[in-house]
From Swiss-Prot:
Belongs to the MurB family. The lineage of its organism: Bacteria, Pseudomonadati, Pseudomonadota, Alphaproteobacteria, Acetobacterales. Keywords: Cell cycle, Cell division, Cell shape, Cell wall biogenesis/degradation, Cytoplasm, FAD, Flavoprotein, NADP, Oxidoreductase, Peptidoglycan synthesis. This is UDP-N-acetylenolpyruvoylglucosamine reductase. PROSITE patterns: FAD_PCMH. It comes from Granulibacter bethesdensis (strain ATCC BAA-1260 / CGDNIH1). It is an enzyme of class 1 (oxidoreductase). It is found in: Cytoplasm.
Amino acid sequence: MIVSAQQNPDVFTALRGRVTHAAPLAPQTWFRVGGQAETLFRPADTDDLCTLQRRVSNLVPMTIIGAASNLIIRDGGLPGITVKLGRGFNEITTDGDGMIAGAAALDATVAEHAAQAGLAGLEFLCGIPGTIGGAIAMNAGAYGSDIASVLDWVELALDGDIARLEASRLSLSYRHAALPPGCAVVRARLRTRPGNTADIIARMQDIRAARDAAQPVRARTGGSTFRNPDGQKAWELIDAAGCRGLSRGGAQVSEKHCNFLLNTGEATAADLEALGEEIRQRVQASCGTTLHWEIKRIGIPFHHPECQS
């Protein structure tokens, strides 16, 4: 049985973060689609988040979001409590031969801080949208590196306590991290190596230029839609299946990069998800390969029979 957070208003008593009931979530996502959060909570800091975790029954769903850059929130919204990490979780500090970053710190901002400190190895982060928390949750990677190659440890809020886990305990693999169910990443330490600031910045400029040339970075999109199958590139399979420019409602496959879905202005989450499923079906029919979603899809569907997990 799922219990509504509003059935127990005392859950939020004396918490310092902001509480909003029936909060629209579309403005919080890069796709600009999705329904409402039954209750949206922006914790002031880690203590605020842990207090909430201790108070909330397991019967109340709790969803953690950050920048929501690689996420589709379905049109029926999110039940229970949606926790959005922001201020209070975005501190970035230099720590010897590494960087410690809060979960809400933007990947690109962490890369920039490392560059200014003369620390190399995190340049790839400037080409990844979203936050450090999300990057860890999916072992994000690009341009020859990934989180698994630089993560030292991660601190998690779980059941109201903070636990520090070494990277070796997360079973990091391609776009996967074995995080404990119900946890929230709060901060992490990333390894670096000494480097020349000018060289690091030049490398980041090259990455940004390559990204701008190949991806629809100024569109309403959610990053790579599907994981690359072993030894193959998803975009090539999608293109070969005739899906470049394919549309469904207000959703469209990018003409610039076939592994990106776009909200052309009036898309719903159902449009995007249905288009993704059509791509999967066409690729399967074309070459026999099953594409798996990289974009995370959460929430309550809005009566769209073609949207399947």
